[in-house]
């Protein structure tokens, strides 16, 4: 298999969240940013506070940010509490959805737009790419783009997963 690429239709996605709800891609209103991660991944630990900033930057309802955990419910809950994550965390402990999307590593983000088309794939942690994702989401929701990671932020420009 190969990682789902830009321009391809996103595989179906239906996963239970830590909140007990089932999240289905085909029921989402607006674009979905799906971020695959593992709780043991140091790059994921670096990235998730910035994903939280992105989540807080734009009104909910016009878009969705879903973290897709490749770990157990208890480990995922501990990660959420440690990092102050408030966006939905979906559980893919059996890796069925991860295998369908086939990210090369974690974190990997898939921005899924209208018609379930993958419009952006961002592997690893990339400062510039997070700000570009922010601008794209702002366009979807009709808001001014928010800078998620300012130039003077001490995070490295890139960190592989």
Regions found by a protein language model. Name each.
Residues 38, 70, 114:
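Cofactor-binding loop segments of dinucleotide-utilizing enzymes, especially the Rossmann-like FAD-
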Residues 24-45, 51:
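Short active-site neighborhood of thiol/selenol oxidoreductases, capturing the structured segment around
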Residues 1-32, 64, 81-82, 102-105, ...:
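Non-globular targeting/processing and membrane-anchoring segments
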């Amino acid at each position: 298999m190969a990682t789902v690429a830009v321009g391809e239709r996103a595989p179906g996605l239906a996963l239970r969240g830590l909140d007990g709800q089932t999240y289905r891609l085909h029921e989402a209103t607006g674009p979905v940013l799906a971020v695959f991660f593992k709780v043991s991944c140091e790059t994921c630990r670096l990235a998730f506070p910035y994903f939280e900033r992105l989540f807080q930057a734009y009104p909910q309802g016009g878009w969705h940010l879903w973290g897709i955990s490749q770990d157990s419910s208890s480990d995922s809950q501990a990660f959420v509490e440690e990092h102050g994550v408030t966006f939905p965390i979906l559980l893919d402990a059996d890796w069925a959805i991860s295998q369908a999307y086939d990210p090369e590593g974690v974190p990997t983000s898939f921005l899924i737009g209208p018609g379930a088309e993958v419009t952006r794939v961002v592997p690893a942690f990339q400062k510039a790419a997070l700000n570009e994702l922010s601008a794209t989401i702002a366009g979807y929701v009709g808001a001014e783009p928010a800078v998620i990671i300012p130039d003077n932020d001490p995070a490295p420009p890139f960190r592989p997963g």
